Structures are given as structure tokens and as C-alpha cells.
């Protein structure tokens, strides 16, 4: 599918148009204007050129979110090379494997990651460059080392009469050219490299421009890892082409850091995973109304509306009080928290997608979102549910269109397993679609639990209810010997703060189990529970690695 516009042209135009505006800020650290970004892009181009990098070569980036991470990304993509973003949470052997599998010729790396890497395990690299100052601790090329030592001098010779907007002219891409190889967080073995062409990036960015409405000078806080396409697309790529001021928290945000930074920055759009929203609402908002008086007043006409408005204002303030909408994605959203947000008319929306679609498949503006859905299929995409009755009987959701990947890098067999002969991507998610086109995700196909009586059980639906019960931090539902077992990581700090002993906590969890079973049909009731002392291990997008918890001991 050919798109008339050019993604590289959008980057170039944004830099030229917003030359004197703030572009990138490390929270409590450096700020770069768009003109500073342009200068650093040119300097990185000098390093790439002297390292012998050619168009189409792979360049890996591994580090925490930062201004220099995004500058490096922009430099690589405007040079015509292929970006290989690597999640900073990956272990050293995973980083080594991805660098080698992708055939990356350079690795840009954060200092905390670099400390744990072994350059000998990545023998094909021309060099390793530090993100913080673009130093070159490892160079297998004399020209690269010389270029770094004389970078300002070379830049001065290249632009002797002051660097100006007119000096910027990036080569435009071809729609099907490979832009990114994004290695999925993957829960088994080494992850697969998703090949995203410029077509996919451009289509995703254009969709955001059409639906979200950021303007030059708006502020956006980047919380999601830029190595994952959700944060990369919604925060960074869309934001930069719109001329926004992008702030990086540079570390995993706690509710305290979020409240502090959002109050100062007052972002216009917030993209985050459900876990962040759920924690804030369960800790700061729901306790104020989750009592007999609160529930009573919420059902009294006139008073109810005023209370809802007060709650909404309080919730808005937690996120800075200036945003158009909060875009939630990356994992299932707690149904009871969502129902509460809907009740107070809070401006949230659900986005659904996959790395393989860069990532957008479904999304609707918050004013159009139907409760429990993830919106409608995005522009330039089509989707269907493989079911005899898609509105009533869940089936696998498949999609195709402009956002779709080229395939998995050097893995044709894996590509054939997910993209059929008609070009449909099999998402692995069970869903229904109503008559208005709203998509409802029921759970992962691979997570579906099938009992001996033939009943299909979606564990995510039960977990959503259980996670909202007293002192439950997170949970997993598994099937053992044809019985459902609830694995629970309790909120022990909260329980002990309320004077509960360990035996009290066990008693409360049993009460939770009995109360939950009253809300469930007989075939999906929990037979027993098991408490876990530590939170469940997760992927980068905060999905629990379920495969680790399928074989539990008494």
C-alpha cells in the first residue's frame, strides 16, 4: 500500500518549523531544542559515515528513555539505516543475541547497560558508542575513533557558515523500505525481530495526527519504554512530528514521581499501560468512595453528579489536569476500574495493537469509546473475527492493512505461522465485534482454559474481578487437575498497615474467593488459592509471563 506522504519528510519539516522550540528534556536534566536535535543528528551522521555505515545497515540502540536515545534513533533513520531498538531490561545474553541476529554494525548503549555487556560476544560490531556523550569505548575502525576525537572540527568544516534549517535535507524513503527491526518482549526463548517498513510507521503516525490532535509546543511525558512500539509511536514518533516538547522520566515511574512530574509538566496526552492507571486509582481515588457512605451518595440524584465531578477533578489533577485523553494499552485493563472511569466521565481510551502492526490495530477517541471495548479498527486497517457469529461468539481476531509488518527477520517459518496466504495477520487474541464495529478483546488464544466438560474460560476476565478485591495486588488463574486455582500476589504493605497478620491475610483471601465465586458461573469458580511472596515476573509491556506459573506446587 503506497502512502503519498513521507515519514522522513515529516521529521525534516518538524525540525525546520519548530527550530527554536524545546524538543526533548530529560526530567531534572538537559533540554534540547529542535535546532539542537538537528545538530546532533548531523554529528551522528558523521560518526556513521566514518564507521562505513551504508543505507540499510542495522544500528542497535539499548538504553533507558532519554533525549540522546531519541536523537540517536532520528539520526539512524534519517541516515537511511535500520534502527534496532533493544529494551534496556533485557539481560546481557539477550542483548548479545539480538545484536548478532540483527547483524547490527554499531551499538549505541546506555552506561548502566554497557557495564554488563561483553564486546567479545558481539564480534561483528564496528564499534560501541555511549548514548550519554557519544563517546566510543570500543572501535574496530580507526576512522570511527578519529571522527569521534575530531567531531566538532569535522562538523565545522562541513558547515562553515553556521548550521541553519536550510542545511537540512534528508533523503526520503521508499514506502516498503525496512525502517525498524523491533525484537518483541517474547516470553519463550529469544524474541523474534519484527520488520516494520516506513509504510507502517507513517500510517501509524498519520493515524495519531488524524485522531489525537497534539499541537506544536504541547508537552508529552514519555513513561513507556521507547524500545517498545507503543511508547515509540504514541509518545516519540507522533510527538516529534507534531512539534511537541517530549519529557523523559528516565526511570520506571512511581506514583509519586508521576504526580510530581505531571504537576510540573502538565502533559496534553498520556500513553501508559493499565498497571499505572490501576495503581493510581486503587491507591488514591477508589478508597475515597469505596465505602458505605460513598456508595450511597453516588446513587442519590443531584448529589451523585456533584460527587462524580469532584472525583473526576481529583483524578484529572493527579495526571496534571491538562490532558486531552489518556491512552491505555499494552495489556488488559481492569474491568471495574474502567467502569468507574466511565461513570465519572474520565477522558480515557483503550488502544489495541501489536508490535507486528507498529502497533495500532484498534482505537477510538475517548468520547466515542464503548465500555469494555478497545475501539474500532483504525484507518487503513481491516479486521475480522474468525467465528460463525462474530458479535456473539468469540473467535480469533485477524487483521491486515498499511500498518502490517514485512515479517520476522530471518524467520520465514514464523512469518508463515502468523500471516496467512491472504495477508491476514493472526493476532492470537480472542475477540468479538459488535454491529457498530467496536472490538472487544476476550483474552489470548493461548491463555484460554478448556475444562473437561468443554467449557471455555478466559482467565483474564476472572483476574480482572479478583484484582479489585481487598488486598489483592495482582493475580493469575490457572487450571490444575481440571480445577481453577487463583495465584495471588497480595498487597502485604497495605494489609499490615491495617493491622492484619499473615493468618488474617489468608482469611481475607479465602473470603475474597468465596465472594468472587458468587459472581461467577459454576464452571469458572475458583477451587483454591495460593499466595505468592513476590510480584509475578513480567514482560517490558507489563504482561505477566504466564508460562512460568503453570506448574505450581502445593
Where are these regions (language model features)?
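Structural core segment of the AMP-binding/adenylate-forming
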Residues: 10, 51, 78-156, 482
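Gly/Ser/Thr-rich phosphate-binding loop
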Residues: 268-271, 281-369, 473
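AMP-binding/adenylate-forming catalytic core of the ANL superfamily
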Residues: 90, 107, 401, 406-407, ...
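Conserved AMP-binding/adenylate-forming core of the ANL superfamily
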Residues: 3, 22-52, 57-66, 70-74, ...
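Conserved C-terminal "lid"/linker of ANL adenylate-forming enzymes
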Residues: 449, 474-476, 482, 513-554
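Conserved AMP-binding/adenylation subdomain of ANL enzymes
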Residues: 202-219, 226-313, 322
Amino acid at each position: 500500500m503506497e502512502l503519498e506522504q513521507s515519514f522522513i519528510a515529516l521529521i525534516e519539516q518538524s525540525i525546520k518549523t519548530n527550530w527554536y522550540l524545546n524538543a526533548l528534556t530529560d526530567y531534572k536534566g538537559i533540554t534540547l531544542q529542535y535546532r539542537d536535535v538537528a545538530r546532533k543528528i548531523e554529528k551522528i551522521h558523521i560518526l556513521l559515515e566514518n564507521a562505513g555505515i551504508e543505507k540499510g545497515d542495522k544500528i542497535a540502540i539499548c538504553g533507558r528513555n532519554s533525549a540522546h536515545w531519541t536523537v540517536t534513533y532520528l539520526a539512524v533513520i534519517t541516515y537511511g539505516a535500520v534502527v534496532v531498538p533493544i529494551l534496556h531490561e533485557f539481560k546481557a545474553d539477550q542483548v548479545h543475541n539480538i545484536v548478532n541476529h540483527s547483524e547490527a554494525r554499531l551499538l549505541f548503549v546506555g552506561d548502566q547497560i554497557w557495564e554488563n555487556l561483553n564486546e567479545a560476544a558481539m564480534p561483528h560490531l564496528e564499534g560501541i558508542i555511549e548514548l550519554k556523550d557519544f563517546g566510543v569505548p570500543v572501535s574496530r575502525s580507526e576512522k570511527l575513533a578519529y571522527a569521534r576525537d575530531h567531531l566538532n572540527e569535522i562538523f565545522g568544516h562541513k558547515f562553515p557558515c553556521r548550521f541553519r534549517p536550510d542545511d537540512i535535507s534528508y533523503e526520503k524513503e521508499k514506502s516498503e523500505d525496512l525502517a525498524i527491526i523491533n525484537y518483541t518482549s517474547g516470553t519463550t526463548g529469544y524474541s523474534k525481530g519484527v520488520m516494520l517498513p516506513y509504510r507502517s510507521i507513517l500510517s501509524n503516525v498519520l493515524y495519531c495526527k488524524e485522531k489525537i490532535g497534539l499541537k506544536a509546543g504541547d508537552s508529552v511525558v514519555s513513561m513507556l519504554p521507547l524500545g517498545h512500539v507503543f511508547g515509540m509511536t504514541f509518545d516519540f514518533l507522533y510527538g516529534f512530528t507534531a512539534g511537541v516538547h517530549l519529557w523523559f522520566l528516565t526511570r520506571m515511574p512511581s506514583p509519586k514521581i508521576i504526580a510530581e512530574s505531571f504537576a510540573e509538566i502538565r502533559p496534553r496526552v498520556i500513553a501508559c499501560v493499565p498497571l499505572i492507571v490501576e495503581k493510581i486509582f486503587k491507591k488514591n481515588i477508589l478508597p475515597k468512595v469505596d465505602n458505605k457512605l460513598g456508595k450511597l451518595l453516588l446513587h442519590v440524584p443531584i448529589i451523585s453528579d456533584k460527587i462524580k465531578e469532584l472525583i473526576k477533578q481529583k483524578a484529572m489533577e493527579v495526571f496534571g489536569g491538562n490532558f486531552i485523553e489518556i491512552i491505555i494499552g499494552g495489556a488488559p485493563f481492569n474491568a471495574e476500574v474502567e467502569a468507574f472511569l466511565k461513570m465519572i466521565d474520565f477522558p480515557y481510551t483503550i488502544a489495541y495493537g501489536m508490535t507486528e502492526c507498529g502497533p495500532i490495530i484498534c482505537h477510538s477517541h475517548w468520547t466515542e469509546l464503548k465500555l469494555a471495548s478497545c475501539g474500532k479498527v483504525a484507518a487503513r486497517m481491516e479486521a475480522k473475527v474468525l467465528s460463525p457469529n462474530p458479535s456473539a461468539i468469540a473467535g480469533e481476531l485477524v487483521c491486515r492493512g498499511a500498518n502490517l509488518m514485512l515479517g520476522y527477520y530471518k524467520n520465514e517459518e514464523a512469518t508463515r505461522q502468523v500471516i496467512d496466504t491472504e495477508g491476514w495477520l493472526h493476532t492470537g487474541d480472542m475477540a468479538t465485534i459488535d454491529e457498530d464495529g467496536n472490538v472487544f478483546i476476550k483474552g489470548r488464544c493461548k491463555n484460554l482454559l478448556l475444562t473437561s466438560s468443554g467449557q471455555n474460560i478466559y482467565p483474564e476476565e476472572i483476574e480482572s474481578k479478583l484484582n479489585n478485591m481487598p488486598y489483592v495486588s495482582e493475580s493469575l488463574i490457572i487450571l490444575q487437575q481440571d480445577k481453577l486455582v487463583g495465584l495471588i500476589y497480595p498487597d502485604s504493605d497495605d494489609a499490615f498497615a491495617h493491622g492484619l497478620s499473615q493468618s488474617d491475610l489468608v482469611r481475607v483471601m479465602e473470603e475474597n474467593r468465596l465472594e468472587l465465586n458468587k459472581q461467577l458461573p459454576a464452571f469458572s469458580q475458583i477451587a483454591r488459592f495460593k499466595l505468592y511472596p513476590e510480584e509475578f515476573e513480567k514482560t517490558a509491556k507489563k504482561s505477566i509471563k504466564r508460562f512460568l506459573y503453570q506448574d505450581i506446587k502445593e
